[in-house]
């Protein structure tokens, strides 16, 4: 057995045990040390990916390692690293230095890495649940705050609903095909079709697509802001890599699946963007933005095309970078006395914190899809991919939804730069980790916009 193939997961598992054991003996004041240690293990795990021998299959062909899922793991670890660095000062200022937090992020990340390497529906379920259960805990960490408890409960309910649908869908696929291992299916029947629809629905719920989005904004709003950054990015990367794999295997035998995905995509794009205009909280606005982006991403799954898939995976990654950057700025601002993320708090922010206002504006422009931000190329790639695969009408709807979204992002920027603040919140401290995350994500969003081939070429080769 090629044990080298699971080197990234093994390093992360060692990191979890190390941080867990140290947390038992160290006082809360060493929380920063545990966060940095967890970050080091994330870096080591990411570095080890370059030494993995692939392709490889392990555990009775239920776990595979290939170029595509190694890229997915690298993306997941990169974004997790940024979240870890940005979180320790935030929780210190909130007097919530939970020693469990660093290894909870690692456990969720390990589950997602196992999930995208799985070629067996049962192992996918195991990885998915390892990540999901950990994320329920992360949402409810501010247990003294009502919104955090409410968000955790709601996230638990919607998460277990998705789990139930996935389990039943997998059982139906197994009943119709006689195997839990993913392989090209040539024939469909009623049981298989129903199983595929349930699996699509379960994963759509996990990525917060309409109509499975209910309570997602509440969970995002109630969670600690660095946790919201994690929830809205890292699991999405894992889910869309899994979606691509399932599209190439299971869904190819069910030709009508694309209409199900198309419906979910259109509903998510327009609902998320329209309802975002009614929000008074910028944090909640970004939650609805993530629902709209789920719709954008799902449009790329309506056809089996490597160029569409490569644009999707590139888009998901750069969207994650921009979103983590935006939420990190919100986390920094939240440390101010009386800050609530209400639009009124952002009035005249350029006068109090010109650098933070400028960085947040950059991330919001990136999410709109304005060049040279890399998100623009992701959107452009999906649009041309839809046109190329004769999905012209869907491509037009995709473009219209993107234009609609510009308004609410620009509203935040207008409040920051064109209005004068009525309430002064004063300056705030920025930790080294937060500064590195904001500057690092901003640099990568622009860098990949100018040099997209650095990532796209690897994804295209992996898909080929």
Curated annotation (Swiss-Prot):
Any one of the GO CC terms: plasma membrane
InterPro entries: NADH-Q_OxRdtase_suN/2 (IPR010096), ND/Mrp_TM (IPR001750)
Reaction(s) catalysed by this chain's protein: a quinone + NADH + 5 H(+)(in) = a quinol + NAD(+) + 4 H(+)(out)
E.C. designation(s): 7.1.1.-
Signal peptide: none
Keywords carried by this UniProt record: Cell inner membrane, Cell membrane, Membrane, NAD, Quinone, Translocase, Transmembrane, Transmembrane helix, Transport, Ubiquinone
Keyword Endoplasmic reticulum: no
Membrane topology annotation: Multi-pass membrane protein
One Pfam family matching this protein: Proton_antipo_M
GO annotation, biological process: ATP synthesis coupled electron transport
Predominant subcellular localization, coarse grouping: membrane
Family: Belongs to the complex I subunit 2 family.
Subunit structure, as described in the record: NDH-1 is composed of 14 different subunits. Subunits NuoA, H, J, K, L, M, N constitute the membrane sector of the complex.
Name of this chain's protein: NADH-quinone oxidoreductase subunit N 1
Protein source organism: Aquifex aeolicus (strain VF5)
Lineage: Bacteria, Pseudomonadati, Aquificota, Aquificia, Aquificales
């Amino acid at each position: 057995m090629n044990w080298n193939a699971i080197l990234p997961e093994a390093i992360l598992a060692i990191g979890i045990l190390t941080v867990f054991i140290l947390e038992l003996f160290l006082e809360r004041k060493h929380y920063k040390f545990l966060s940095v240690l967890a970050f080091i293990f994330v870096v080591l795990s990411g570095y080890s990916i370059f030494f993995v021998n692939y392709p490889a299959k392990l555990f009775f062909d239920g776990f595979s390692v290939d170029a595509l899922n190694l890229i997915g793991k690298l993306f997941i670890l990169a974004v997790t690293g940024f979240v870890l660095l940005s979180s320790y000062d935030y929780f210190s200022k909130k007097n919530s230095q939970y020693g469990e937090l660093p290894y909870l992020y690692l456990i969720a990340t390990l589950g997602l890495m196992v999930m995208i390497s799985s070629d067996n529906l049962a192992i996918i379920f195991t990885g998915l649940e390892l990540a999901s259960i950990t994320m329920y805990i992360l949402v409810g960490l501010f247990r003294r705050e009502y919104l955090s408890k409410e968000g955790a409960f709601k996230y638990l309910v919607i998460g277990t609903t998705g789990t139930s649908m996935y389990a039943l869908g997998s059982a139906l696929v197994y009943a119709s095909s006689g195997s839990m291992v993913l392989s090209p299916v040539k024939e469909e029947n009623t049981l298989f079709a129903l199983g595929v629809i349930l699996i699509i629905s379960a994963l759509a719920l996990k990525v917060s697509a309409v109509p499975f989005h209910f309570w997602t904004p509440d969970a995002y709003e109630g969670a600690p802001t660095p946790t919201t950054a994690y929830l809205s990015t890292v699991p999405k990367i894992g889910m869309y890599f899994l979606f691509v794999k399932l599209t190439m295997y299971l869904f190819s035998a069910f030709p009508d699946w694309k209409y199900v995905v198309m419906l979910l995509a259109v509903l998510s794009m327009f609902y998320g963007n329209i309802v975002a205009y009614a929000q008074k909280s910028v944090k909640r606005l970004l939650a609805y933005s993530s629902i709209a982006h789920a719709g954008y991403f799902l449009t790329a799954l309506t056809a089996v095309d490597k160029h569409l898939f490569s644009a999707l995976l590139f888009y998901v990654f750069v969207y994650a970078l921009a979103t983590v950057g935006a939420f990190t700025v919100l986390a920094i601002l939240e440390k101010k006395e009386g800050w609530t993320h209400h639009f009124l708090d952002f009035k005249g922010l350029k006068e109090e914190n010109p650098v933070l206002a400028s960085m947040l504006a950059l991330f919001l422009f990136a999410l709109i899809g304005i060049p040279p931000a890399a998100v623009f190329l992701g959107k452009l790639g999906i649009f041309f991919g839809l046109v190329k695969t004769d999905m012209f009408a869907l491509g037009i709807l995709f473009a219209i939804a993107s234009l609609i979204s510009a308004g609410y992002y620009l509203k935040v920027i207008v409040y920051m730069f064109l209005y004068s603040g009525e309430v002064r919140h004063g300056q705030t401290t920025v930790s080294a980790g937060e500064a590195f995350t904001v500057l690092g994500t901003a640099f990568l969003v622009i860098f990949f916009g100018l040099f997209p081939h650095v990532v796209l070429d690897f994804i295209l080769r992996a898909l080929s």
